């Protein structure tokens, strides 16, 4: 009995008919395609994109050179050098992130006691050379200045879960 059914299905091209029915069913539904450069998709509030160093409202950088982010980075993408200041506190003289090594795990952001290093909302940072993906302190501070309103809002919303 099953061989007869199998033969009838192969003669009537049942697979082709069922495939075409599925195609026509989806053809009549609304489109879900996003026209990317002109339309942007939804980003999660916890999206981890390009890194940034934040500043306090008075313009002073937040990083206290504790080097916790450097120690916790599983990819060893962060390099920090620090010097003591005249008031006894420490500040970074060099803060580099090799974005070619970074795995965007967010451990650096979690380890930072003063929310100095954060991962911002930008995911469009393609480069033509490897050197463009070696971020220094100036580049990271510029990123932080550019996205500070978005970063502060995101951190306030996420504060209950930290």
From Swiss-Prot:
Judged by the first EC level, this protein's enzyme class is translocase
Does the UniProt entry include the keyword Magnesium?
A: no
One GO cellular component term: plasma membrane
Q: Which UniProt keywords apply?
A: 4Fe-4S, Cell inner membrane, Cell membrane, Iron, Iron-sulfur, Membrane, Metal-binding, NAD, Quinone, Repeat, Translocase, Ubiquinone
Give the EC number. 7.1.1.-
The way this protein sits in the membrane is described as: Peripheral membrane protein
The record ties this protein, via Pfam families, to: Fer4_7 (PF12838)
4Fe-4S ferredoxin-type domain residues: 53-83, 93-122
Residues annotated as binding [4Fe-4S] cluster 2 = 73, 102, 105, 108
Q: Where in the cell is it found?
A: Cell inner membrane
Q: Where does [4Fe-4S] cluster 1 bind?
A: 63, 66, 69, 112
Major site of localization recorded for this protein: membrane
- Tell me the cofactor note: Binds 2 [4Fe-4S] clusters per subunit.
* HAMAP family linked to this entry: NDH1_NuoI
PANTHER family per record: NADH DEHYDROGENASE [UBIQUINONE] IRON-SULFUR PROTEIN 8, MITOCHONDRIAL, NADH DEHYDROGENASE UBIQUINONE IRON-SULFUR PROTEIN 8, MITOCHONDRIAL
Could you give the subunit structure recorded for this chain? Answer: NDH-1 is composed of 14 different subunits. Subunits NuoA, H, J, K, L, M, N constitute the membrane sector of the complex.
Protein name from the UniProt record: NADH-quinone oxidoreductase subunit I
Query: Organism source for this protein?
Result: Rhodospirillum rubrum (strain ATCC 11170 / ATH 1.1.1 / DSM 467 / LMG 4362 / NCIMB 8255 / S1)
Q: Which gene encodes it?
A: nuoI
């Amino acid at each position: 009995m099953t061989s007869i059914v199998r033969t009838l299905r192969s003669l009537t091209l049942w697979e082709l008919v069922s495939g075409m029915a599925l195609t026509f069913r989806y053809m009549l539904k609304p489109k879900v395609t996003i026209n990317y450069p002109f339309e942007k998709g939804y980003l999660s509030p916890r999206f981890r994109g390009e890194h940034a160093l934040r500043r306090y409202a008075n313009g002073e950088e937040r990083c206290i050179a504790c080097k916790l982010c450097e120690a916790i980075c599983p990819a060893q993408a962060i390099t920090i050098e620090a010097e003591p200041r005249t008031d006894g506190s420490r500040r970074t003289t060099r803060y580099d992130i090799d974005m070619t090594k970074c795995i965007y795990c967010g451990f650096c952001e979690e380890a930072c006691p003063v929310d100095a290093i954060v991962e911002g909302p930008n995911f469009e940072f393609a480069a033509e050379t490897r050197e463009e993906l070696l971020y220094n302190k100036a580049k990271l501070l510029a990123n932080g200045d550019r996205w500070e309103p978005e970063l502060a809002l995101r951190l306030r919303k996420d504060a209950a879960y930290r």
